[in-house]
Amino acid sequence: MELLKEAIRKRGSVLSSGVLKVDQFLNHQVDTNLMSAIGEEFARLFADEHVTKVVTIESSGIAPSFMCAHSLQVPLIFARKKKSVTMDKENVYSSRVYSFTKKEYSEVTVSKDWLCPGDRVLIIDDFLANGQAATGLTQIVEEAGATVAGIGIVIEKSFQDGRALLEGKGYRIESLARISSLEGNKVQFVEESAHFAYNKS
């Protein structure tokens, strides 16, 4: 998605060979016009999957997920990292997930009231790195007896093993921007890497 790639190039900051900072438009300050376009693109990509619910993890996944759910005209559910006092702890689906950015585990939960066996669920997240967050959400969806209709990722770090992990389990993945490298404080996209390799040969 060129609009997203342009935002990454102009407004993203490479902090290390493994960390891209995008808090100017995605996970702190939110560019609502860009999120709207991202939501519409996910809705277009998964239009044939008969999605009934969109699921994400709080909090950075909420903005793109909301726009996607709005475009699909279906409810959005966000898994909580901390149990609410209003949530019956005996009436939840839960999974333990590891955050690549925060270097810590979280127990994420979804109320059993909102996921049903007949649901076809689209999982949306802001980043795909090692695939642990998305895997945790697939476990919750499947524990509910629902079906994972697909996984939509805003920014994928293709140099990490998240895609291989999820595709190995048979899930459909659509990423709007795939980054092949952050080496040298420069963002390199998968398509650009392939083009460079072709030209070199």
From Swiss-Prot:
Q: In which pathway does it act?
A: Purine metabolism; XMP biosynthesis via salvage pathway; XMP from xanthine: step 1/1
Q: Which residues bind xanthine?
A: L20, N27, K157
Per UniProt, 5-phospho-alpha-D-ribose 1-diphosphate binds at A129, N130, G131, Q132, A133
| UniProt subcellular location | Cytoplasm
**Catalyses which reaction?**
XMP + diphosphate = xanthine + 5-phospho-alpha-D-ribose 1-diphosphate
Stored InterPro entries:
PRibTrfase_dom (IPR000836), PRTase-like (IPR029057), Pur/Pyrimidine_PRTase (IPR050118), Xanthine_PRibTrfase (IPR010079)
One GO cellular component assignment for this chain's record is:
cytoplasm
UniProt keywords (A-Z) are: Cytoplasm, Glycosyltransferase, Purine salvage, Transferase
Annotated EC: 2.4.2.22
Task: Offer an example of a GO molecular function term for this protein.
Answer: xanthine phosphoribosyltransferase activity
Entries under HAMAP family matching the protein: XPRTase
- What family is reported? Belongs to the purine/pyrimidine phosphoribosyltransferase family. Xpt subfamily.
Q: List the protein's name.
A: Xanthine phosphoribosyltransferase
> Which gene is this protein's source?
xpt
